[in-house]
């Protein structure tokens, strides 16, 4: 039986993870949130050292020896489930600099590939370099996007201490960092289908991806 692969890329707050989760549940596929792996590394570094020091050899050794496992989208560091700690503010603050490090990207790549290769039925993987690097052979490649203003409003509606203006500035800065980073920058591939979901609900976005997938599936 063929194992179907759906790649979902996009900038911050574009709805990648929520949409991918809904698509996976509707199709009966597995779902891998790539961002959680970078968050797990970040959390491990902050918990061990109190800060993230890019290029630090001691921290590099720590990361390379760190055991990271994914089970049903729960993330385990050295056997401990740290899933509930991945959205802490301190992780938010440092994850961008962590994701820039080439050796960390290589470690995460290895974990992603091991999860994907073990899947038998189908998998939806979301992130920022899925179609370009992680699953260049995906059956369907989707690039989700929306204006920075729309994405800032979504984040603002989730609650939290930051104002809309602060969130908008943060998203614009993250977009710039993602698109200009040296290793695996955020970009829509020539064969990715771009979905601008400013005026679409989560359900509508998921249904559109499923419609596109059914079209691909019909040719296999």
Curated annotation (Swiss-Prot):
InterPro entries with a match to the protein in the record: Cytidylate_kin (IPR003136), Cytidylate_kinase_dom (IPR011994), P-loop_NTPase (IPR027417)
Enzyme Commission (EC) number: 2.7.4.25
Keywords: ATP-binding, Kinase, Nucleotide-binding, Transferase
Positions bound to ATP: 10-18
Broad class of enzyme this protein falls into: transferase
Family of the protein in this entry: Belongs to the cytidylate kinase family. Type 1 subfamily.
Name of the featured protein: Probable cytidylate kinase
The organism of origin for this protein: Encephalitozoon cuniculi (strain GB-M1)
């Amino acid at each position: 039986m063929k194992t179907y692969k759906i790649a979902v890329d996009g900038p911050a707050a574009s709805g990648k993870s929520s949409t991918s989760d809904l698509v996976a549940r509707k199709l009966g596929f597995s779902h891998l949130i790539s961002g959680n792996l970078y968050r797990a590394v970040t959390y491990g570094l902050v918990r061990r050292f109190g800060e993230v020091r890019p290029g630090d050899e001691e921290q590099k050794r720590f990361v390379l020896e760190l055991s990271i496992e994914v089970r049903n989208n729960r993330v385990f560091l050295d056997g401990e489930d740290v899933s509930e700690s991945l959205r802490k503010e301190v992780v938010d603050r440092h994850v961008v600099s962590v994701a820039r490090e080439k050796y960390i990207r290589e470690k995460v790549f290895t974990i992603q590939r091991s999860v994907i290769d073990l899947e038998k039925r189908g998998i939806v993987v979301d992130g920022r370099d899925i179609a370009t690097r992680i699953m260049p052979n995906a059956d369907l490649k989707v690039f989700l996007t929306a204006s920075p203003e729309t994405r800032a409003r979504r984040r603002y509606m989730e609650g939290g201490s930051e104002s809309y203006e602060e969130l908008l500035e943060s998203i614009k800065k993250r977009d710039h960092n993602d698109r200009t980073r040296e290793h695996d920058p955020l970009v829509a591939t020539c064969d990715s289908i771009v979905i601008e979901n400013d005026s679409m609900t989560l359900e509508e976005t998921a249904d559109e991806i499923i419609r596109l997938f059914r079209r691909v599936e019909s040719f296999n």
